[in-house]
Amino acid sequence: MGVAGGQYLDLSYEKQQVSKIKIIEMAIKKTGKLFSFCCAAPAIIKKMSSQQVKFFENIGSNIGLLFQIADDLIDFKGDSKIAGKKTRKDQKKGKATLISLLGYENAVKYCDKIIFDINKSLKKYGSNSKNIRETLVYILNRNK
């Protein structure tokens, strides 16, 4: 199940008690699959091993998860004028998010953990991973 399946889960989980694992799985399907492909495609084109392709797929899934949580954080606390879209929709609709389950601060801490884990995985690439590391910080700190 990919992006469409993740969106289906998002809609079906509204106003439901959903576990952390299910929320994470939904976010990975909803957003992580897109980032997963974007990260794996260069490895596929370069004809890297299946193990290396899987490594980059996992990095992409985690970046997508981070992006989805960051988007939920913007919805929760963001300014509609700055974000360029209506905010505070998730809570009104009863969306299953890590914020609704863990609270805002714990969702931010979870994002910090995702960033730490991705950076740890990319450590072997040294300065070649600088742009990705900077992008991770941008994703979390963006306001639109």
PLM ranges: what are they?
Residues 1-144:
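All-alpha prenyltransferase/terpene-synthase fold signal
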